[in-house]
């Protein structure tokens, strides 16, 4: 407890120099109070998720720019954070899943892969994201990488669920895409 107090005291001294940020103690909780002049991308993202404000393509691009900077509280695992992290991850996956199909694999394969990767970061066994990523990789003629992504996904699926992923690579990949594969 004293280590926490020392850390907060140091934090307060640093933040004293910034007029727009304050550390408050209220009802046995520390609160970081930001003035309206302060922009915090994390809080902006949280507001967008709570209000379900990601409705248009420009909204999505702004939202994606924020979340693509990294996983929320990466590496932190405290019981009191679990519900919060789960809310952020699930809400983020919902938004990403809603918008991924607005991008054409033929015209924007790289963007589809980026969005699929972001979904898989938040939900490592998301089958929809796997399908989008594999389709985009095959469209780019990255057959070996598509197979590698599939194999990694299957290993993780086996580890998480204790059973094999139910679909083979050939079942996952639409036949017209497989016929594009050049002989090796």
Predicted features by range, described:
Residues 123, 140:
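Terminal recognition/anchoring or ligand-binding modules at protein termini
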Residues 141, 161-162:
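Glycine-centered helix-boundary capping/hinge motifs
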Residues 1-121, 127-128, 145-152, 158-160, ...:
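Intrinsically disordered, low-complexity protein-interaction/activation regions
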